[in-house]
Amino acid sequence: MKFNIAKSELASAINTVLKGMASRSTLPILSGILVNAREGGEVVLETTDLDISIRHIMKADVVEAGKTVLPGKLFSDIVKALPDAAIGIQAGSDSAKVECLGTSYTLSVLNPVDFPYFPEVAADTVIAMQPALLARAVGKVARSVSKDESRAIFTGILFTVEDGHLRLVSTDSYRLAVADLPVACGGVDDFQAVIPGRNFEDVARLASSCENISIGFADNQIVFTFGPTTYVSRKIEGTYPNYKQLLPTSHEVGIRIETKAFVTAIKRVALLAQAHTPLHLHFVEDLQSVTVSAATKDVGGASELLDAAVEGGDIEIGFNHQYLLDGLSSLGEETVIELQGPLKPGIMKSAEDDGFLYLILPVRI
């Protein structure tokens, strides 16, 4: 195998496939990058950790077709360190040489025969959209994905199509995020799939510079195709909880507040709130205000008064301040808060109604 390629092109390709490489595996082959130089001027890079598989195709000056498996992390570090010029790669059965200007590296290689086959997914359903739309929606729901691996279903993002409407949902059982995407799904049968949250975030980031992304669904796999990249992920098995029954259909108290001012006040007051100390919100209709306060025993307390449009009466309620900030970070200039009572979940959304809704459980105060 022998080919020449621009450093920038190779570095970008390696950065794309690195996410599919196993960082801690008892199988050395999974820590490598399969490099396949094809006749016709194409070089294909592949990685897999057996849960996800990534393939990236790039143009190159292929002198001799062939395959090899290079040590992924070391190969990446070498390419990053080389000057911005053409890189030559030549591989035999036992070693490979990487050359650029006056610099030369020799690396041990693994047998490409031992590298797992790339999964060819026959998708039953395919949906196409702009990567920017997907990235925006994934970014809004990602913060509510659970990190508790013992509850695998909550570590994923629910991707659902219902009556032609596309929606992403996530929850860690303390808060719930729902994002509707303005994507036409007419002709697509209703379905749902749970995609690992970290994988979904990786795809949204990797596809950001592409014009289009297609998402295909098979029995137990999802395939994302964007530009010259194919990303295959497993689905998370299991039944996602019925989140709709958690969404209130009415509220007692409605509030409108300027998002930036609210966030700033929460951050200031939270300096006196420990991790498990609730942030106290007191909404007063007559004063059209909210008092944000917190107190920690043997430390002290803080409070801040803000203007707020309050309808429906007064209410005092406590929330985890970090969960509040996570929700507010996805909202527009003005936030709408809907409350049913001091011990019932609250709803936050943008006054602009951008299709995003954030439900948060209160903390007893």
Predicted segments with their positions:
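Structural preference for solvent-exposed beta-strand-turn elements
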Residues: 1-365
